[in-house]
């Protein structure tokens, strides 16, 4: 890797529009416009596929309005979720099947790409030979509970998912962040795409593990200046989001959570209580 700024432009050969961006969206009327508009500002993105996952708000209506001015924007609709599938995985798999580009960029409806983000991702792929490039987004925090808990949670996750280890082909460590996960189409198809991780709640990490196990190079790094996300806009949403994911992220067993608590700063139990994280115990 070079020491260039994260926003530096990719070499001319990689600046052609070669990326299909895929955005699963369920009830994202407050965020979808900013996300789509940020994708539309990336010259390297040839098409934007928003997959409306049975929204009951104005998400689809907003996207249809944006289609009038963003000609490379398409709206897809999911049907019933097949048995054994997580809803989001079904949505992104539908988008991937419809996409035409040699690179697939999976991002979330609450993510906003910064200028030069797609070019930087392609540049990293070119320089490192990575078939999967992922950034851990810059987290936007506004409320007191976001400012208190989001940095804490991400500091703990950094302990488990070392960028250096993930990017080392000799290490079995693998991770990615689904808020910005770009993958070469051929590599994606060869490991079975999201169909191979259909039931995984942490589909981004599962996909990275499958890619690395198959011999593909990964690149994972910080996303400051690349992509920004405000994950939760209410305490209730944060409660539901992290209690679903945090248990799995730290190891998926009661013992792993206890070890995490032992090694963390003293107020981690408070954070777990605030998030409503329940550790299963044998009955």
Model feature map: region roles:
Residues 30-34, 57-66, 75-77, 116:
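Acidic helix N-cap motif at the loop->helix transition within catalytic regions
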Residues 58, 109-124:
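Acidic donor-binding/catalytic loop of UDP-sugar-dependent glycosyltransferases
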Residues 37-46:
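Short, acidic, metal-binding catalytic loop of nucleotide-sugar glycosyltransferases
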Residues 1, 249-283:
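Alpha-helical bilayer-embedded segments of polytopic membrane proteins, i.e.
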Residues 17-20, 47:
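Cell-envelope/extracellular polymer assembly enzymes that use nucleotide-activated donors
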Residues 125, 131-158, 189, 194-256:
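Catalytic donor/gating beta->alpha subdomain of glycosyltransferases that bind UDP-sugars
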Residues 74-95, 120, 124-182, 186-190, ...:
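Long helical/loop segments within the catalytic core of UDP-sugar-dependent glycosyltransferases
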Residues 38, 52-62, 80, 111:
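A conserved acidic beta->alpha catalytic loop
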């Amino acid at each position: 890797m070079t020491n260039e700024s994260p926003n530096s432009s990719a070499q001319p050969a990689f600046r052609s529009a070669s990326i299909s961006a895929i955005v699963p969206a369920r009830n994202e009327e407050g965020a979808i416009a900013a996300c789509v508009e940020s994708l539309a500002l990336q010259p390297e993105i040839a098409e934007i596929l928003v997959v409306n996952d049975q929204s009951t708000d104005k998400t689809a209506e907003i996207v249809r309005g944006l289609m009038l001015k963003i000609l490379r924007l398409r709206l897809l609709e999911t049907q019933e979720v097949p048995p054994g599938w997580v809803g989001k995985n079904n949505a992104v798999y539908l988008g991937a099947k419809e996409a035409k580009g040699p690179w697939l960029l999976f991002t979330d409806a609450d993510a906003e790409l910064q200028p030069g983000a797609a070019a930087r991702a392609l540049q990293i792929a070119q320089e490192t030979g990575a078939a999967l490039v992922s950034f851990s987004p810059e987290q936007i925090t506004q409320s007191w509970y976001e400012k208190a808990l989001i940095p804490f949670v991400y500091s703990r996750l950094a302990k488990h998912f070392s960028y250096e280890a993930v990017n080392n082909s000799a290490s079995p460590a693998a991770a990615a962040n689904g808020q910005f996960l770009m993958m070469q189409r051929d590599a994606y198809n060869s490991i079975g795409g999201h169909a191979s991780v259909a039931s995984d709640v942490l589909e981004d990490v599962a996909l990275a593990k499958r890619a690395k196990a198959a011999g593909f190079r990964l690149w994972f790094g910080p996303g400051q200046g690349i992509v920004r996300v405000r994950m939760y806009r209410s305490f209730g949403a944060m409660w539901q989001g992290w209690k679903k994911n945090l248990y799995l992220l730290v190891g998926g067993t009661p013992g792993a959570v206890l070890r995490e608590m032992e090694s963390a700063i003293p107020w981690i139990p408070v954070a777990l209580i605030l998030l409503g994280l329940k550790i299963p115990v044998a009955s």
